[in-house]
Amino acid sequence: LTQAQDNMTGCADANIGRGFAGPSYQDMDQIEYITIATTGDAADFGTTIVDCYGAAATSDGIYGWWHGGRASGGWGNASNTIQYLVTATLGDASDWGDLDFAGYTYSCTCSVADARVVQLGGYASSDYRNEIDYYTTASAGNSSDFGNLTVGRSGIATLGNGTGAVAGGGFPSGGPVTDLMDYI
């Protein structure tokens, strides 16, 4: 990385062999990338349109998306912005649309087969959220309601295979961390 950072989120694009990381608490709008096939340091890719520490990220091999996150100045400065970049071209992120609520520590997964990005849970307005939202990768737009997690929580690990997705773990209201898994 170009500087010491923590609590970053990232996504990868195997088609062009790049991995993307950022933003972090230290640099809330910075996106960096590495070339997976070679050793070496990260380089500047561009910046996000809004600060988004604690955002979730995913990629479909063409675009990379960042969801929500927060700006400096405290936990109350959350965003509902969906930002994207074209993974093959260096440059700044652009606005894709909005999530249903502003928050951070979301989790998300991309399902290439049915061209959807699914965003799960998160933390907003002093509440651990149970919402599951989605949007299609075919064109920019706002997210829509998909359903609910069994328990609202943030910091969930997610993965999808084009048919379904699994959301595991996370931090529910009142803690401690959970071993709960949801399947969609």
Regions found by a protein language model. Name each.
Residues 1-184:
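Polar, enzyme-active/binding microenvironments
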